[in-house]
Design a protein with these regions (language model features):
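Conserved SAM/AdoMet-binding glycine-rich loop
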Residues: 1-96, 100-104
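C-terminal accessory/binding modules appended to enzymatic or scaffolding proteins
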Residues: 6-11, 24, 159, 164-181, ...
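Ordered, helix-dominated protein-protein interaction surfaces in large eukaryotic regulatory proteins
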Residues: 13, 24, 84, 120, ...
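Flexible glycine/acidic-rich beta-alpha junction loops that bind and position SAM and/or redox cofactors
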Residues: 30-33, 57-69, 89-110, 122-162
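Structural recognition of alpha->loop->beta junctions
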Residues: 40-49, 116-132
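Conserved, mostly hydrophobic/aromatic
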Residues: 54, 128, 190
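Amphipathic alpha-helical packing elements
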Residues: 169-213
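Acidic, low-complexity intrinsically disordered tails
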Residues: 202-255
Length: 255
């Protein structure tokens, strides 16, 4: 074992320190750039207390560009390797993704894209952070000016409380309380193909306890459950639900 005092395993050599866990804050995009996977493996084996919080925040490339975040392919690759290493050491560990709605640049179509991504990958977030402006961030600059300060091009900003509610509801499309908002959002975006009982539909044809809506799209019979599998379909995550704490206050990304 290397003897560098800065190596991750050095933490385990400190007298009186039994465990050191990283709950969040990992820059997974930087981690993927390291050709040496020893830190990644150390992290998974010794420094995760059941679940690790990471921040893909969105899946739309246009929105992620405004956030200054890597594209979703980086998160997918991180997830794949995380669960591969977890399986190799025979542990049951989870990823808890931070997600954000209504960030400057996020239109209704982007929120629908994210909802479809979550459904496809069996992710059901218990908490979603709606964007709100805080001083000193590029995102806040875009929120108030409706301009990208780097290009001076116009940026769409959802400021109306109802428009923001539509985007937020889509990220929790599976919650019956969000049915009316999701239905309105999908109709407004002309995506009635996502209303029905088909495997790709986000919401059923009828609201809970209501009548079927013959304007909906999906035709396949049966319903789809979300199993909470990791991105990429790794069956290491067997469907047990990890209990998640509220995200707290998250704001626009600082540059």
């Amino acid at each position: 074992m290397p003897s560098s005092p800065c190596a991750p395993w050095a933490l385990r050599q400190v007298d009186g320190v039994k465990k050191v866990f990283i709950r969040s804050g990992i820059r997974y995009d930087y981690l993927l750039c390291d050709p040496d996977d020893s830190f990644f493996r150390e992290l998974v084996q010794h420094h995760v207390s059941g679940q690790l919080k990471v921040a893909p925040e969105h899946c739309s490339a246009a929105v992620l560009d405004k956030m200054g975040k890597p594209h979703i392919e980086a998160y997918i690759e991180f997830s794949r390797r995380y669960f591969t290493y977890t399986g190799q050491i025979q542990k049951e560990q989870y990823l808890v993704p931070y997600l954000m709605s209504s960030h400057p640049g996020s239109r209704l179509d982007d929120a629908i894209e994210l909802a479809c991504f979550l459904k496809k990958n069996h992710i059901r977030p218990e908490q979603v952070q709606d964007f709100y402006p805080t001083p000193g961030t590029i995102s806040t600059c875009m929120f108030y000016t409706e301009l990208d300060p780097y290009t001076m091009e116009p940026v769409y900003v959802a400021k109306n409380s109802h428009d923001k509610a539509l985007q937020r509801a889509l990220l929790q499309y599976y919650n019956p309380k969000n049915y009316a908002l999701c239905s309105e959002a999908l109709r407004r975006a002309h995506r009635t193909d996502l209303i029905g009982n088909g495997p790709k539909c986000l919401i059923p044809a009828a609201p809970p306890g209501g009548r079927p809506d013959d304007r909906s799209g999906g035709k396949a019979k049966g319903s789809v459950r979300g199993y909470g599998k990791p991105v990429g379909g790794n069956n290491r995550f067997n469907g047990k639900s990890a209990k998640r704490k509220p995200y707290g206050n998250r704001s626009g990304k600082k540059k």
